[in-house]
């Protein structure tokens, strides 16, 4: 029964996530806030993930779109020879793909002209393992996207770990510490022996709100013990977790 409840809650969060959209967020504040919550529970930093989906002018030219995508990559100090580029530009499809896979970061950027009325840029930055001094990079990316879009969806998640198994009651202590740090109210929680998932509304996160069970949420916290490696992972996301855990 617990597994069924967990599955239903995760599916519900994924459905809700498809509906979120906002134009004026502050990635510096969001990253700093998520990082401070990880620090307050003394978890070891593992990586940071962020996903963007920006609706742009549908009549953007191929060359201009290509230039925007390469400018995004430059923000993170990626050299030309580290970029894998591909495109599918014809009468049926108009798509540009850029992929970067380095030791400390993975970047996937797509520029898509879906039809005569819709065009998008999607940016997926995963496993960003650099911990300090990355706020400026995300601020610059945010500003660049705002030059071309007034409608951007953003999902951010910071991941930490403990290199051991924790007592089950410690999960609640960790959750309480994060909620306190975020000035957050718990809205819903599911817990079993090796897993905890909670959604909440944090006063310090003044954006990216979703409606969940009739209440506003902007914070998703999960704790999972991975028995195969003997480590406990903590996921702190706003507004919801969009990665596998």
Where are these regions (language model features)?
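N-terminal leader/presequence regions that precede the main folded/catalytic core
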Residues: 1-105
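Soluble, non-membrane globular domain cores that form compact, hydrophobic packing
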Residues: 9, 16-20, 24-35, 135, ...
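Short, hydrophobic/proline-enriched secondary-structure or compact coil segments at domain edges
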Residues: 46-56, 116-126, 232-239
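Beta-strand elements of well-folded, non-transmembrane domains
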Residues: 56, 127-129, 162-164, 225, ...
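Solvent-exposed, acidic/flexible segments
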Residues: 58-65, 134, 168-171
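Extracytoplasmic beta-rich ectodomain segments of secreted or membrane-anchored proteins
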Residues: 70, 74-170
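Intrinsically disordered, low-complexity segments enriched in Gly and acidic/Ser/Thr residues
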Residues: 162-215
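A cross-kingdom marker for long, charged
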Residues: 205-245
């Amino acid at each position: 029964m617990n597994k069924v409840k967990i599955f239903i809650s995760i599916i519900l969060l994924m459905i809700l996530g498809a509906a979120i959209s906002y134009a004026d967020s502050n990635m510096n504040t969001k990253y700093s806030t998520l990082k401070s919550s990880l620090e307050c529970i003394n978890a070891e930093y593992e990586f940071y993930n962020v996903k963007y989906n920006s609706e742009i002018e549908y009549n953007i030219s191929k060359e201009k779109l290509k230039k925007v995508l390469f400018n995004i990559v430059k923000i993170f100090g990626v050299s030309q020879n580290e970029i894998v580029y591909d495109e599918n530009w014809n009468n049926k499809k108009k798509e540009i793909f850029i992929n970067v896979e380095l030791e400390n970061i993975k970047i996937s950027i797509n520029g898509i002209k879906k039809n005569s009325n819709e065009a998008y840029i999607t940016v997926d930055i995963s496993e960003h393992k650099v911990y300090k001094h990355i706020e400026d990079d995300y601020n610059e990316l945010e500003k660049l996207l705002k030059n071309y879009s007034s409608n951007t969806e953003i999902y951010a998640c910071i991941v930490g770990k403990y290199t051991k198994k924790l007592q089950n009651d410690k999960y609640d202590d960790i959750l309480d510490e994060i909620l306190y740090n975020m000035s957050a109210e718990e809205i819903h929680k599911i817990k079993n022996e090796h897993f905890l998932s909670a959604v909440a509304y944090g006063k310090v996160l003044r954006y990216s709100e979703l409606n969940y069970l009739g209440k506003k949420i902007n914070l998703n916290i999960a704790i999972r013990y991975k028995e195969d490696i003997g480590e406990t992972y903590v996921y702190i996301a706003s507004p919801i977790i969009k990665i596998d855990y």
